[in-house]
Amino acid sequence: SNNYLTSISIPTSTVTIGDNVFYNNRINSIAFNENLESIGNKSFSNNKLEKITLPANLVSIGNEAFANNLLASADLTASIENVGTKAFENNLIASVKFSTTMEIIHEGVFRNNKLKSIDIPANISEIGSFAFSINKLQDLEIPNSLLILGEGSFAFNEIDEVDFHDAIERIGPYAFYGNKLQMVKIPQKINTIEEHSFANND
């Protein structure tokens, strides 16, 4: 990182971008090639990115890869199987589209953004700690596939209603802390509801 880069174009021969490659610059424009399959940890963290178009063959996005930018949206509908922890933390993301090949939404992926609604696909079985905390979420539909909600996963939003399906096994601590919940439907067979899961709602 040199704090001077503002625009980059990834060559067609590049399949993998390693860790920290463009960390902490002033990049506001990226042209990805269609052969790119993997983006490393913190590769584009701490830049000025407002928009990105991820290539169709992309499979993996590393931890904090796009954290601390100015992104307004995230389209993860390519071939993406894994999005690392805090990959899009601290942006301005108001809309997100998920891949149907993802099974886990990891820790802090969209923490501290501007999301008002999300469509969680039916293949997601686990949502990690603080994955969607500190957003503007109002509407939330829990898919039948969801088994585990991590700590603080939806804390500090504006959610007013949650309806869990029978498959849910664990609701982590502080999962819905600091929302606007008026109604919660919890199935009888749930194994674990941890401390402060629904605390501090008004």
Residue ranges, per PLM feature:
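Structural signature of tandem-repeat unit edges
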Residues: N2-T16, R26-S38, K48-S60, L70-N82, ...
